[in-house]
Amino acid sequence: METINTIELTDENTFPDKSVLKKVLGRSYNAYVGLLKLYDNNDLAYEWRYYRDGKAWLCKVQKKKRTIVWMSAWKGYMQATIYFPERYIDDIFKLSITDDTKDIIQKTKNVGKSKPCIFEIRNKKALGDLEKVMKFKILTK
């Protein structure tokens, strides 16, 4: 039987600092650090905040005031999600990303009129496709 993972960082009073994230992410913590470097290299700002509607801490990643990526912590990995209007989906599939990533994006259900591109960051290998999709998001209007 399949076990469904649940989002971590649900305690409003516990800020997701380095020690908290190391505990939640475990071996994937180094990939998270690589992810932060990727954001820094692309002049993106990131900030953890508790969202009452979702009852969890989320990290919003922005270029100037535009949200590019949303991150959430799960047991053993960081999830990074980039939302696109439907009109960009065909262009995403033209990017040089792996077929596995394209398959995941294609199978993910839309949220309203947006398509979430979800990446499970368990190791640094996952950062390549994320970076390509993220840079495409930065270029779109």
Task: Report each predicted region and the residues it spans.
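Charge-dense, helix-prone N-terminal extensions
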Residues: 1-141
